[in-house]
Amino acid sequence: MSMKKINFVIVLLLFNFSNLFGQSDLDKFIDNWHLSATKANYETYFGAMDDSFIFLGTAPGERWSKDEFSNFSKPYFDKGKAWDFKASNRHWNYSKNGKTAWFDEDLDTWMLDCRGSGILIKKKGEWKLVYYNLTVLIENEKMKEFLELRDEKK
């Protein structure tokens, strides 16, 4: 094998390992964020968010800034019972400059199967969550029943 090929393989391996290690750190970051809600650790949960954070919840009117979401959530955290989301099947994507990462994940929750998606930015060497969208998953064949339930509430 020529030196050019060897060097190319080494660079390729280093790049892939650095992405894996970065992804592992981000997985830990998001896992810890979910765990802090489970343990009702208010400071850790909201400390992971940038001041510009936006949370989209499952109800039509749920679009909260960090402060709004914090005010809504604080009583749950104060009671020691926030929520318990178990994540799996997480997928990551990254900007070319490495300062933005976005993901989607499957969630096992009290609402059964949900999906979350989020965006993180790196500021001053630290990752912060700027956006999270929580959705309840509904099979297509159950959509008609779901729409009928929504109509009943109007």
Feature-to-residue mapping (PLM):
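Bacterial Sec-dependent N-terminal signal peptides
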Residues: M1-L26
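A short gly/proline-enriched turn/hairpin at secondary-structure junctions
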Residues: I54-S65, P75-A82
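Short, well-ordered alpha-helical segments enriched in acidic and aromatic residues
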Residues: K39-L56
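Short beta-strand edge/turn micro-motifs at domain boundaries
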Residues: D113-M143
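Surface-exposed, charged secondary-structure patches
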Residues: D25-D27, S70-L112
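Short N-terminal segments immediately surrounding and downstream of signal-peptide cleavage
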Residues: S24-A40
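Short, low-complexity, Pro/Ser/Thr/Gly-rich segments in the mature regions of secreted, periplasmic
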Residues: K142-K154
